């Protein structure tokens, strides 16, 4: 009985792994998620903070701070779509494919050009998720689109003053 149960579990996990691997082939699109930004205003971030990644919100294992911290969010977060809200948290997909939870008060939809339905398209590229912005979508942390502090831009510019 134990051997047949163990065999069934092993077979089931191999089938599930095969389905999972097939679904996540490099370059394949990921559905069920949408791009949001962290809310720089709610987090009181300066452009310098955003450039350096200071003050970005934590990501948790579950929909509570007590569930354990997985890490810190990036500027663009991939939210489960439609939004999966629980206890003030929103479920997200992290860059490496892990599921996490972030406070719903520190994220917001992407900026969009007037009349645009722009969002994003996600794809799995081996071991990372990549996003491509749809026409009209802006991955800006600040309304004016000037995310790069002037001193950082000039230091990295190919065109000297």
Give names to the regions the model predicted.
Residues 16-21:
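Sec/Tat signal peptide C-region and signal peptidase I cleavage site
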Residues 62-75:
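SH3/SH3-like (including bacterial SH3b) beta-barrel domains
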Residues 4-14:
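Sec-dependent N-terminal signal peptides
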Residues 76, 90-94:
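SH3/SH3-like beta-barrel fold
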Residues 54, 58-64:
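Core beta-strand residues in small-molecule sensory/regulatory alpha/beta domains
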Residues 78-83:
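Beta-strand cores of secreted/periplasmic/IMS beta-sandwich domains, seen most often
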Residues 54-56, 85-89:
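Extracytoplasmic
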Residues 22-47, 93-161:
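Boundary regions of SH3-family modules and the immediately adjacent low-complexity/disordered segments
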